[in-house]
């Protein structure tokens, strides 16, 4: 029983570490996108936003991905492009 608990705790710690790494990657990408947008002319920003939104619109829904997840992704991309980090 102790081995089972120890193994579960170890797996939980691994998952937490993976989660931290993913969060760091997302934060880094947000910083990069924000910096790029801030250094672009307004018309170039809008062109990029339109292209990204167009690409998202054209993506075919995947039955294996829940609609809520797809909508969450779309909302987050829009938020990032229209209101980058301060």
From Swiss-Prot:
GO terms for cellular component: cytoplasm. InterPro entries: SigmaS_Anti-adapt_IraP. GO terms for biological process: cellular response to phosphate starvation; negative regulation of protein catabolic process. One of its GO terms (molecular function) is anti-sigma factor antagonist activity. The keyword Coiled coil applies. Disulfide bonds: none annotated. Keywords: Coiled coil, Cytoplasm, Stress response. Residues 1-36 form a coiled coil. Induction: By phosphate and nitrogen starvation, and in stationary phase, via the alarmone ppGpp. It is found in: Cytoplasm. Inhibits RpoS proteolysis by regulating RssB activity, thereby increasing the stability of the sigma stress factor RpoS especially during phosphate starvation, but also in stationary phase and during nitrogen starvation. Its effect on RpoS stability is due to its interaction with RssB, which probably blocks the interaction of RssB with RpoS, and the consequent delivery of the RssB-RpoS complex to the ClpXP protein degradation pathway. Interacts with RssB. Belongs to the IraP family. This is Anti-adapter protein IraP. It comes from Escherichia coli (strain K12).
